[in-house]
């Protein structure tokens, strides 16, 4: 039997996430709560761990305390077996400076690669919502002989201009790479679809080391994986695409096969939550064969009293809904909603309190927000714009710990 390749996972988790403000005012983007019981980073870590890639370094930088704590408390593996998920803050090994880009983050962390000496390196982002079996991508990478493999998701050409786009030939070899093009290239088998980069890469170790070193010496580089490293390897004929549509995740439904969402804006973050709440959700959190991990808490079950109800909603542990109505919403843990309150089409994060007779519609309430009795959020957008953040799509976002 062929010995399994030695794979090191590196997760790029230093994103500031300015477009998600106020949710990122006090935390890194990958630490933002999602789905009633998780954080964004839990999706990539679950994919890697479910695929049995159990040596993972998480590179952090921006306001990383809550992210570091979450990983340390909820992602403990067996150190005796050489398994680990470890947060690695910017080490400043090359002087008193932070990472200047994702490729520079790898360059400043090269000691991790040298210490582990892997055959292949999986480099994934930390702020997307999806399920994927990365082992299948690794196998294609090995069989293709490419130096780098980029995960691509098929999107309509009319929507592809927001992404880094991949022009591949029939064999999957990447012959062109364009950031946010006005005229995106079609896929080899469908001219109306485009391969958009998912920000997930697999490298043969020597190829990555050589490319990162060369990039570090280039004063004109922005030191970005997608903007500099991949185009360099494409120019050298060393990069191929992995079609995400071919990834088969155990337990996936027909509706959520191939699901992937970039939640980099408030509207996208909100919409991804609404994908969770229907009877047959677009993204199914309840796939026991490929579970999303990292969200366990020692809390009592949710409770509904005095006729409180929740319809087409996700309700986190420890929450109490008393004589209140919740519809089409995602509630995290330890949420309390008092008599007569109405919550519709909203994302409610841990520890939120919604008072008697209050109304919350089309809103995102960050941790520990308190909505007083009779107060309204998402009902009068002109009033909300004076005190909160309102997205282009009309989603009202209230920052952590605000009292209304």
Curated annotation (Swiss-Prot):
Enzyme Commission numbers on file: 2.7.7.27
Reactions it catalyzes: alpha-D-glucose 1-phosphate + ATP + H(+) = ADP-alpha-D-glucose + diphosphate
Involved pathway(s): Glycan biosynthesis; glycogen biosynthesis
Residues engaged in binding alpha-D-glucose 1-phosphate: 99, 164, 179-180, 197
Pfam families, A to Z: Hexapep_GlmU, NTP_transferase
GO molecular function terms attached to this record: ATP binding; glucose-1-phosphate adenylyltransferase activity
HAMAP family in the record: GlgC
Protein name in the entry: Glucose-1-phosphate adenylyltransferase
Organism: Mycolicibacterium gilvum (strain PYR-GCK) (Mycobacterium gilvum (strain PYR-GCK))
Record lineage: Bacteria, Bacillati, Actinomycetota, Actinomycetes, Mycobacteriales
